[in-house]
Amino acid sequence: MADLIVVCGAAGALGQAVVAELAGHRLDVAAVARHQPDPNLVPDPTTTSPLLHRLGADLSDPEDVERLWAEIDELGQVAALVNLVGGFAGGAVTNTDVTTYRSLIELNLSTTWWVCRAAARRLSGQGRGAILNVGSRTALHGGAGAAAYAVAKAGVLKLTEVLAAELAPSHVRVNAVLPGVIDTPANRASMGKTALAGAVPPEAIAKVISFLVSEQAWPISGAAIPVYGWG
């Protein structure tokens, strides 16, 4: 059985770019999305890895996460986890309702916690590996208008730091990338040209992620790396 790179949140624009980038390097990828099979994952057969596994799971459900990882265990030893699950909604502290707050914390932070916990339990026994989480520029510079989202992403960064410290004795690296605005079809549809002027293509971020989970990045752990360009 070959080493796997697990990509959670693989159906989104960034997820598809990451899966395609890894597949382009002929790596074995377990692409996880909420609903599977997803025909959008690596649509070009020329970029298909030797083994591309399409898996489905509700990553906000701890029991379903454990079921997912039991399935992954049958596919091979995990070399790296790329955790891209998340979502955005605006709102100030004073006008964010309970449902929106809980949804953003669950989608951005809780999913990351459960998936990282399952991965860490396995990687710590291997003596090698990598975990890559996705934070946000707003986690460092929380401006007005995205309160719950910024708090959730700040939690992702702190979780990344804690895991990096906990897994250091096992030589498992844990890092995060910090996007700003990503140039995706959804953002193009909802944002004006001015807001998109400095947007970064998902393919560019995918190349950074691919490097960070590779053995070439072995000296890097506990880092929060900006990938928002000049925007």
List each language-model region with its residue ranges.
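Conserved NAD(P)H cofactor-binding loop of Rossmann-fold oxidoreductase domains
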Residues: 84-90
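Alpha-helical segment proximal to the catalytic Tyr-Lys
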Residues: 121, 164-169, 218
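C-terminal substrate-recognition "lid" of short-chain dehydrogenase/reductases
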Residues: 203-227
